């Protein structure tokens, strides 16, 4: 028995399949095949009809659109609704006749509709209502023709508006139709002539909602879009108006560097401080150093940013930069070097410098770009950029804080600037702990300056914090000489901020440990930058450091030496983030070392923030390498900063 059934089943479709999914209750088993055949015969007709219907539908939709337009126009001109309805109705009919749209014949037979309601619905939602002619009311709606017409118009309108391929005209009307639909809805509810069977009504409402939703959704979207543009524009203007034009810089930075945030901040500072001033000056030598520095600073911006602003402001616009770069020292000292590191950056920045000329915005950006250019090492730059990006995100959180701080700070006059710078730096560096950082820093910064002179002592003094400062100071010393002041503070500040981290990180251990460190920085700086630039006392140390570092071919070697640096690229990316977080030693140390020499570890390790400073300083010297390295490491976090700093 079962086999027969099965055979039968294989031969014949299961009843539900036979009629398009609609079981045919009275059918005997014999009727199945027949039903199927009938269906097959009907199919071509169905297909054709659908095709024609689609075409007609397009035409109808066009008609409805025109009617809608007319209605809208009339509404605007204040005609009464009755008049509007009448006119629209006649207009619609006229158009229909003209377009050759069939009203009645084109609709498939009722039985087909019954059989395949789904299909019909999909093809022609507009056809749900029975056809109607102007004269006789709607076939199955007992409300007056005008009322029905309103429904139908609405329905079609509504359908067309949500249809997939709306004619272009539709957009214009969206608002009107939206309004209208609301009105219509109201009307419909008022005209409680059960104009539509409950089912139909439900459908209508659903559709209506859908339309409204999509309508308003798209409208909303559009609105947002424009709003954002507008707001963007507004922001831009505001920023332009801002004193330092920080924002522009900021903005630029963003784009320009990943760290936009920070950078920009820094940038701001840098630039902002003396945008115009900077422009020219910076542009020239500033560009060299400043920009380098700036760049550097920029990066740091977040961290050093504050400092910079001031420094920048400081008359040493360049200095500022330097400070920024802060790794002022580096900026100055390393002008050459920075150049290189910066060079890369600069390359990027190069354009900016001119921009800088532009002043506010540009300046900022210039520095940043410069910084970037300065970055000199492409890889470094790349790394830095990466870091920056990271930093940016990270800093975004701090940035505001930082930025605010920075902003204020910059305010300080140049004179104070420096110290500010220091403070800033520190704050920046401190980044994380901006509040405190800065102060100490500043203090340190001052000290740094003094120290700078002292260079060494500070170094020693750095002790914990001092190391950094020391380092920085130290570094600053060497560098400081040139930039000395700024750097000093910067350094100092950094350090200080760093110091915490620093210690461990601070190269102290790594480098030469603290003492060494102290020397180290100096040395590195000297070594790197100083050496070149300074030759200075640092030289011996530098040599030592160099030896230590292995080759101070700056970037490369250093990097090579430090395990961390060994695979800079990987490290940077992978390690970047963590380290900062984990500011501690490892990276620090490695960083340190890399940096340390220069700025020394302190920077690096220190905390990222510190790192910044530090290497910023150092980096400067070594900056690029260091930076990178540093950057890579802790820097990441700060690195970014740092990186930037250095990098830039």
UniProtKB/Swiss-Prot annotation:
GO CC annotations on file? nucleus
Region annotation Disordered: where it falls in the sequence: 1-44, 99-139, 154-648
Q: Where's the CWF21 domain?
A: 55-98
Kindly give the InterPro entries that the UniProt entry links to this protein: mRNA_splic_Cwf21_dom, SRRM3_cwf21, SRRM_C, SRRM_Domain-Containing
Q: Where is the composition biased (Basic residues)?
A: 168-186, 199-211, 219-243, 381-409, 545-560
Segments of skewed composition (Basic and acidic residues)? 99-109, 525-544
Annotated CDD domains:
cwf21_SRRM3
Cited Gene3D superfamilies: 6.10.140.420
Q: Which PANTHER family match?
A: SERINE/ARGININE REPETITIVE MATRIX PROTEIN 3-RELATED, SERINE_ARGININE REPETITIVE MATRIX PROTEIN 3
Family of this protein: Belongs to the CWC21 family.
The task this protein performs is described as: May play a role in regulating breast cancer cell invasiveness. May be involved in RYBP-mediated breast cancer progression.
Q: What is this protein called?
A: Serine/arginine repetitive matrix protein 3
Q: What is the organism field in this record? A: Mus musculus
The beginning of the lineage is:
Eukaryota, Metazoa, Chordata, Craniata, Vertebrata
């Amino acid at each position: 028995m079962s086999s027969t059934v099965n055979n039968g089943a294989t031969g014949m479709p299961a009843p539900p399949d036979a009629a398009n999914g609609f079981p045919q209750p009275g059918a005997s088993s014999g009727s199945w095949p027949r039903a199927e055949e009938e269906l097959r015969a009907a199919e071509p007709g169905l297909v054709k009809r659908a095709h024609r219907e689609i075409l007609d539908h397009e035409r109808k939709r066009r008609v409805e659109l025109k009617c809608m337009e007319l209605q809208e126009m009339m509404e605007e001109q204040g005609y009464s609704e009755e008049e509007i309805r009448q006119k629209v109705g006649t207009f619609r009919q006229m158009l229909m006749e003209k377009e050759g749209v069939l009203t009645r014949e084109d609709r498939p037979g009722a039985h087909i509709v019954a059989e395949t309601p789904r299909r019909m619905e999909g093809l022609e939602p507009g056809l749900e209502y029975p056809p109607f002619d102007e004269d006789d009311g709607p076939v199955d709606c007992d409300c007056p023709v005008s009322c029905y017409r309103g429904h139908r118009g609405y329905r079609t309108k509504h359908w067309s508006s949500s249809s997939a391929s709306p004619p272009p005209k539709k957009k214009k009307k969206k608002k009107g139709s939206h309004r209208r639909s609301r009105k219509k809805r109201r009307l419909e509810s008022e005209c409680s002539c059960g104009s539509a069977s409950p089912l139909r009504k439900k459908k209508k409402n659903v559709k209506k909602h859908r339309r409204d939703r999509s309508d308003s959704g798209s409208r909303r979207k559009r609105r947002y879009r424009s709003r954002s543009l507008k707001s963007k524009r507004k922001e831009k203007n505001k920023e332009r108006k801002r004193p330092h034009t920080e924002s522009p810089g900021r903005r630029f930075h963003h784009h320009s560097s990943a760290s936009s945030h920070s950078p920009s901040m820094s940038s701001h500072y840098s630039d902002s401080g003396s945008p115009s001033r900077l422009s020219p000056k910076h542009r020239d030598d500033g560009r060299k150093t400043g920009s380098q520095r700036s760049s550097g600073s920029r990066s740091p911006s977040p961290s050093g940013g504050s400092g910079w602003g001031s420094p920048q402001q400081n008359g040493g616009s360049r200095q500022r930069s330097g400070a920024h770069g802060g790794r002022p020292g580096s900026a100055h000292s390393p002008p050459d070097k920075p150049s290189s590191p910066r060079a890369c950056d600069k390359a990027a920045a190069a354009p900016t410098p001119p921009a800088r000329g532009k002043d506010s915005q540009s300046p900022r950006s210039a520095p940043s770009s410069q910084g970037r250019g300065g970055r000199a090492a492409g890889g470094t730059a790349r790394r830095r950029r990466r870091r920056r990006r990271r930093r940016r995100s990270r800093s975004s959180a701090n940035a505001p804080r930082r930025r605010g701080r920075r902003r204020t700070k910059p305010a300080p006059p140049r004179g104070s600037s420096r110290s500010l710078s220091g403070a800033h730096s520190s704050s920046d560096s401190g980044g994380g702990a901006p509040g405190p950082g800065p102060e100490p820093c500043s203090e340190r910064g001052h000290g740094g300056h003094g120290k700078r002179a002292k260079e060494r002592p500070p170094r020693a003094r750095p002790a914990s914090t001092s190391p950094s400062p020391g380092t920085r100071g130290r570094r600053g010393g060497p560098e400081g000489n040139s930039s000395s002041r700024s750097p000093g503070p910067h350094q100092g500040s950094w350090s200080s901020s760093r110091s915490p981290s620093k210690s461990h990180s601070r190269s102290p251990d790594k480098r030469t440990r603290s003492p060494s460190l102290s020397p180290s920085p100096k040395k590195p700086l000297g070594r790197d930058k100083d050496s070149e630039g300074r030759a200075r006392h640092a030289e011996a140390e530098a040599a030592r450091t160099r030896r230590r570092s292995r080759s101070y071919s700056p970037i490369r070697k250093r990097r090579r030496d430090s395990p961390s640096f060994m695979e800079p690229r990987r490290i940077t990316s992978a390690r970047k983030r963590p380290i900062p977080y984990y500011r501690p030693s490892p990276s620090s140390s490695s960083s340190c070392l890399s940096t340390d020499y220069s700025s020394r570890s302190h920077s690096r390790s220190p905390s990222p923030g510190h790192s910044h400073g530090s290497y910023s300083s150092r980096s400067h010297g070594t900056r690029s390498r260091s930076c990178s390295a540093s950057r890579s490491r802790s820097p990441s976090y700060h690195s970014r900063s740092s990186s930037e700093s250095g990098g830039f």
